[in-house]
A protein has these predicted regions:
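Conserved alpha-helix/loop element of class I SAM-dependent methyltransferases that forms part
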Residues: 31-56
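Class I SAM-dependent methyltransferase "Motif I" SAM/SAH-binding loop
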Residues: 64-68
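Class I SAM-dependent methyltransferase SAM/SAH-binding core
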Residues: 69-111, 115
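A short acidic, Gly/Pro-enriched loop at the edge of an enzyme's catalytic core
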Residues: 118-126
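A short SAM/SAH-binding and catalytic strip from SAM-dependent methyltransferases
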Residues: 126-137
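A short glycine-rich, Lys/Arg-flanked "PGG" loop and its adjoining helix->strand segment in the class I
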Residues: 141-152
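Conserved class I S-adenosyl-L-methionine
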Residues: 155-188
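Substrate-binding/catalytic lobe of Class I Rossmann-like enzymes that use SAM or dcSAM, i.e.
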Residues: 171, 180-246
């Protein structure tokens, strides 16, 4: 019972937080629509091109789609694929649908809670969840639910906060607890000065003020994927090279701690975030 209470309390806090201002949105629908053309998903994530060029990849779902940039971008590049973005925040879903409509895209966005999607089985050819599950009450359960949505040989594109890369950033802002929110925002912009003020503030809130997050490692997620009958194809930790040994990635990821500290000392933003591309066996 205590677990259930904690579970729903976390969900409620996160929903309230994002209802106030969803992550990665702009001051207007027009600006967001233009950004899709100038910053598309294939540029951000090159390993996806080979997958999406495959005609067998037909049904795509993005879990925790937020403002919709990822799916809207992919839909603009692959208009004939069936693409769905789901998020539990109505404000974000409405925003994403407006951007999609502005661009005359075929993708759609629906309000759904991942933890209520247990009945969706063997449906999708590709699933993504980028920067989402570490804000849920149980990241591993979320991964298991998404894995069940996927068909055999389908793909899972997962992005999570990285324990080694993220911790220095958290410490950096913990040392500023006495500062006002406005001052913290200025400090954040010293690291990552995005040109659109609302966009920058949505990033700042998400990165610095979020009420709940968990940190993860390649080693941890690799073991979980193995238990779910998935094979990791590549990871951002080694710049998505497909030729790797697990032990080398595990050693490499630990070095991200010092890299993160060095970037902060140089007043540079370091994401503290890693991505894994996995395939269901």
């Amino acid at each position: 019972m205590n677990y259930e209470k904690t579970f729903f309390k976390i969900q409620s806090k996160v929903l309230d937080f994002y209802s106030e201002l969803p992550f990665n949105i702009y001051d207007s629908i027009e600006t967001a629509a233009k950004k899709i053309d100038s910053n598309n998903a294939l540029t951000a994530y090159p390993p996806l091109k080979k997958i999406f060029d495959d005609e067998n990849i037909k049904k795509i779902i993005d879990i925790g789609s937020g403002g919709g940039w990822f799916i809207n971008s992919l839909s603009s590049l692959y208009p004939d694929k069936d693409m769905l973005g789901v998020d539990f925040n109505k404000v974000a879903v409405d925003y994403a649908n407006k951007v999609s409509k502005k661009k005359n895209l075929k993708c759609r966005f629906e309000r759904k809670n991942i933890f209520e999607l247990n009945d969706v089985k063997d449906t999708y050819d590709f699933a993504s969840s980028l920067g989402v599950l570490h804000h849920t009450p149980d990241c591993h359960i979320g991964i298991k639910i998404i894995s069940n949505m996927l068909k055999k040989n389908s793909y899972f594109f997962l992005g999570l906060y990285h324990k080694y890369g993220r911790e220095p950033f958290l410490d950096y802002f913990r040392n500023m607890e006495s500062l006002t929110e406005e001052k913290k925002f200025e400090k954040f912009k010293e690291l990552r000065n995005l040109e659109n003020e609302k966009h920058a503030f949505s990033w700042f809130r998400d990165q610095v003020l979020h009420p709940h997050e968990t940190l993860h490692t390649f080693e941890e997620i690799n073991n979980l994927f193995k238990s779910l009958n998935f094979k990791i194809i590549s990871t951002s930790i080694n710049k998505f090279s497909e030729n790797f040994l697990e032990k080398d990635i595990i050693e490499l990821e630990k070095k991200c701690y010092n890299i993160s500290k060095e970037r902060l000392n140089e007043k540079k933003y370091y994401p503290g975030f890693f991505i894994i591309l996995a395939q269901k066996c």
